[in-house]
């Protein structure tokens, strides 16, 4: 069986293999989207296909949507060439339940894949056509937090952004320049309204997207590429809206075991590929079932019936912000960042296996969420923080079939310690005067810095997960030797007092010395990490 339009015509074979096929006419909904696009998405990797593509697929099944999605890739064109084209834009969703069972479903909601490549005239002109269409209601984005960035930490432009500003809309390369160039096309085609919906996992994502688009437009105005009318068009949120969202679904890399299992069921060519740009992707996506997408209901050109989608909630901006803060600062992400790097240093590959087999790590994870997070979280109303955390610990975190690794959870932690730890620490300072009553969060911070030494609890070396601050932090810690606590003096002070990192000086918050003491205990020698965690979570 081939995952192609011709291949899925053999319904009996697919159903016999236990794989559900679309109940709607895939060719018809794809054709309708090509003629009259309604929903475009930028960043067409794993989370998009299984979550956003899955929502659209569900709406098509219900008759709540009448056409597919237009998929646009701005970064890694191999994804369009290797994962979309050979499979006629079909995807295969593999939902992994905690009892080991799986749901297989072919997704037919992805109508067309376009490469946002200004040097490819045919693709670029197609993108212009799509953005000029009055029927277009929304453009959604999963391009990662980095996709919105125009400037380095020192405030200077990234070189590709500098080139985009200089070369103008016709030669745009970066995602923000491509988007702004396409908005200029839409402006010239009749100033049609549009909603631009960031679905990336970062705080106030809509504001971040808006800032980047306005910056690009202003720079092009200065360079003479666009006029004042265009600036007014993109600045008016009644015409071009930037709704905020909160997104949540654990989507690990595609599993080679699942690829082999699918091929054993008779589905051909399921092996994952690693592109030249290091995207790890396959014709299928494996993910957990639970999902949450809270969207600010601000759509000046109308919208599909998104609220009918599985796990989708429409709300106002304040509610979206509270839901996002609940997830990112309290419930889910702090647990990942506090325990994932420690898990690497303790030698646990899988996050779920660690929690299921190490009572102290489970206790620490629960302390982060229940004991230290929930007391200072604001209730968003549409989702109960208590119920959200209960589901995490009862169903989501223990699911070993997800295959989520501690190393994945250690990626880019330096970029997240402010929002994931700092916000809760600040809330304690506001409520109690200082944060000295906290234990699990300081333990997580100490554990992250202990992980940065790249030597595990048995004394073996390992490679760190990618993080833009790896070199800088390792340089600061280079004289510290595991097994020789006397080599640790004041090396952590510049890190723990850095308000750019933690959003607060941890010493002024009353936890800096506590982190230092925990770190000192963790470097005593073999087994010291395990002993330190045991001591503090059972105190």
Model-inferred region functions:
Residues 1-539:
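Substrate/ligand-engaging "lid" and interaction regions
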């Amino acid at each position: 069986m081939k995952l192609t339009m011709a291949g899925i015509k053999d319904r009996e074979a697919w159903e016999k293999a236990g794989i559900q096929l679309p109940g709607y006419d895939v060719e018809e909904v794809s054709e309708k989207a090509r003629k009259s696009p309604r929903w475009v998405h930028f960043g067409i990797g794993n989370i998009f296909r299984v979550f956003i593509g899955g929502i659209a697929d569900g709406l098509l099944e219900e008759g709540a949507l009448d056409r597919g999605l237009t998929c646009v890739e701005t970064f890694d064109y191999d994804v369009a060439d290797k994962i979309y084209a050979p499979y006629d834009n079909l995807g295969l969703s593999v939902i992994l339940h905690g009892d080991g069972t799986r749901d297989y479903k072919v997704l037919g909601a992805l109508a067309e894949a376009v490469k946002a490549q200004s040097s490819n005239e045919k693709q670029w002109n197609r993108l212009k056509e799509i953005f000029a269409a009055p029927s277009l209601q929304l453009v959604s984005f999963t391009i990662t937090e980095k996709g919105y960035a125009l400037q380095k930490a020192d405030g200077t432009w990234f070189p590709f952004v500098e080139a985009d500003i200089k070369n103008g809309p016709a030669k745009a390369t970066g995602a923000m320049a491509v988007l702004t160039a396409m908005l200029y096309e839409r402006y010239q085609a009749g100033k049609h309204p549009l909603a631009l919906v960031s679905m990336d996992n970062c705080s106030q994502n809509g504001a971040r997207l808006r800032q980047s688009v306005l910056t690009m437009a202003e720079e092009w105005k200065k360079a003479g590429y666009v006029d004042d009318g265009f600036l007014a068009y993109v600045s008016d949120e009644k015409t071009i809206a930037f709704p905020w969202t909160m997104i949540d679904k654990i989507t690990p890399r595609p599993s080679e075991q699942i690829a082999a299992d699918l091929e054993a069921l008779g589905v051909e060519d399921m092996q994952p590929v690693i592109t030249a740009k290091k995207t790890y992707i396959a014709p299928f996506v494996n993910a957990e079932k639970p999902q949450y997408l809270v969207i600010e209901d601000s759509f000046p050109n109308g919208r599909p019936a998104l609220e009918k989608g599985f796990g989708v909630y429409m709300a106002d901006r304040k509610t979206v912000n509270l839901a996002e803060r609940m997830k990112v600062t309290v419930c889910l992400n702090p647990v990942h960042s506090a325990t994932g790097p420690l898990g690497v240093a303790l030698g646990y590959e899988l996050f779920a296996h660690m929690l299921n087999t190490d009572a102290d790590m489970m206790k620490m994870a629960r302390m982060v969420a229940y004991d230290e997070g929930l007391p200072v979280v604001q209730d968003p109303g549409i989702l109960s923080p208590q119920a959200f955390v209960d589901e995490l610990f009862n169903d989501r975190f223990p699911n070993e079939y997800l295959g989520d690794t501690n190393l994945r959870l250690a990626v880019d932690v330096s970029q997240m310690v402010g929002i994931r730890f700092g916000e809760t620490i600040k809330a304690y300072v506001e409520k109690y005067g200082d944060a000295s009553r906290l234990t699990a969060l300081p333990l997580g911070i100490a554990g992250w810095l202990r992980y940065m030494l790249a030597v595990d609890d048995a004394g073996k070396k390992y490679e760190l997960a990618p993080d833009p601050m790896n070199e800088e932090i390792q340089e600061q810690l280079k004289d510290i030797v595991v097994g020789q606590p006397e080599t640790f003096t004041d090396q952590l002070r510049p890190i723990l007092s850095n308000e750019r990192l933690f959003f607060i000086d941890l010493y002024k918050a009353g936890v800096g010395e506590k982190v230092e003491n925990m770190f000192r205990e963790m470097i005593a020698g073999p087994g010291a990490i395990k002993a330190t965690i045991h001591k503090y979570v059972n105190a």
